[in-house]
Structures are given as structure tokens and as C-alpha cells.
UniProtKB/Swiss-Prot annotation:
Gene Ontology MF: a single term: glycosyltransferase activity
Protein name: Low-salt glycan biosynthesis hexosyltransferase Agl10
Stated family: Belongs to the glycosyltransferase 2 family.
Pathway: Protein modification; protein glycosylation; Cell surface structure biogenesis; S-layer biogenesis
Record keyword Glycosyltransferase present: yes
Lineage: Archaea, Methanobacteriati, Methanobacteriota, Stenosarchaea group, Halobacteria
Amino acid sequence: MPYCLYDNTCKVQQTMLDDLSIIIVNYKSEEDIKNLYSRISGVAEFVVVDNSSSSELRQWCSHDDIHYIDSGGNHGYSGGNNMGIRYSLDELNRESVLVLNPDLEINKEDIRELYTIHQSTNYSIISPRILNREGIPVNESPTPEGTLFRSIGLLPALPGKEHNLKPVDHAHGSCMMISESVFEQIGYLNESFFMYYEEIEFCYRARRENINIGQCQVVDAIHNQPVDQTRFESSYQVYLDFRNRFLASNSIFSKSIDRIQYTTLSILISGWMVVRMLFEKKIEYIAPAIFGALHGIQNRTGKPERM
């Protein structure tokens, strides 16, 4: 069972955004969380969900304006964030949440800008432009996949641009500001995925309900994804990416014809990605990709013990 800790005696700065909580999930990323907190503390209350039950992190959180939740195990991106989101909405009575990855670089002013735009538009899910370490955008939109799905009616047309927001089919999972009304309308993140593709599936569900999603063109954030992943870590990611793409069919679409169309297109997209692996000589990822696709079609969910 999750364990929650919060020191109600701490003094919260008056400049905090009272209707917003920042959700961060920890899995062996304590130092990243401390660094992120040092940059943006005081802008909104923090909710840290600990998927690795770190006694060090728990002790550190008790000395600051941070709500600490021990999740009791590794529940992945979706499970951990859902705990934090539910706590923020139900216990803290927040109207919006900001889901952040621990390895994200963003400052207080940018969070305030996101919040101001979020509150003043009819976009219920927004994210900044996400850059890699070299300053190259990694969440450019519209994506070929989203364009393809919209062309055959699996997703509605994108709305018009509003203020500094570019309409997109999905936000980047490392930084998403989401209104409470979204969860009331479509539910929470899909916990059957464990990791990867969950923000895309969540946003596709939102888009199917005509919920607007935007990328803020005046706010940038840097996602410090590791460049030294082991072969196993990369293969694990490939497996989950391919598997969860197919798992998304049942949760996004209620009509069988839509599921068939989505699955057919996903097979074509996956095949194209495997061909790219061949050309790029990434042979070691082909087996995880194929097994991931097969297991997704077979509806195998949750955290895989091995590929």
C-alpha cells in the first residue's frame, strides 16, 4: 500500500501557484529530483511518488515543502504518476497537475508561463517544446503517425492555433500540464503499459473526446535522456514501445472497425521501423521489436520480466 508523508508545519512561499501540483516519479533518480527541485522550488507544491522506496529520498522530502508517497514497488510511469495525480486532485484539491520527468531541465518562470497559458485558453493538455542536450526539438508535430490517423478519421482534425500554442496530437510525457477535467472525462494514464507510449495513448483518448492539446511555442525544456544506455535497456525500451503501440488499440477505440484500422496501420508503421533498423544496422533491436508487436497483439500487459 502507498505510504504518504507530508510535514504540515513547513512554510509554503506565498508566490506558489495554489491550483497546481507538480508530480515527479522516482526510480533510482534521487539526485535528478534534488537538482530539479533546486531550480523550481517555490513555484508549486511537489508530490514525489517513490517507485524505489528510497529511505534517503523520504528523509530529504520531510525537510521541504514536498508531499512524499512511497508507492510500495515499481509501478512504472503510469502507475506512479496516477498515484500522484489522484493525491493532488483528491487530497490537495488541485485543479491542474504538471507531470515532470526527474531528468527534465525547466525553470520557475517557464512553469509560470505554461500555467498562465493553460489557464487562459481552451487547451486542457499542454507541454513546452522539448529539446535534447544538443538543443534539437524532439517533439515536433504534427507527426506522420498522427497525420495518418487523422486522414482516415481515427483522430479528429486539429483545432486552430491559439495564443502561443501549436495544436498537436499528443504532448511529450516528460512535461505535461493537465486539467482535472481531463481525468474526469477520459480517466487516468493506462497502467497496463508500465512504461513507454502511455502519454501518446492518453492523448489519443483525449483527442477522440475533442480535448485540445497544445505545444507552447514560447517555453523550452531540456530532456536529459541518457546517452549511455546498455544494450538491454535499449532493447527493453524497443520491446515496450512496439508492444504498447498495439495494446493502445483496445483502450483508445470502442468500435471494432476502428481497432482493425488502427492495428493495420500500426503493423505497417512497425514494419517500416524494422526496415529502418535493418538499414541503420541496429540488428539487435529487431527481435525485441517483433516480440513486442506480437505480445501487444496478444494483449500481454504490465511489466515484462524478460523479453
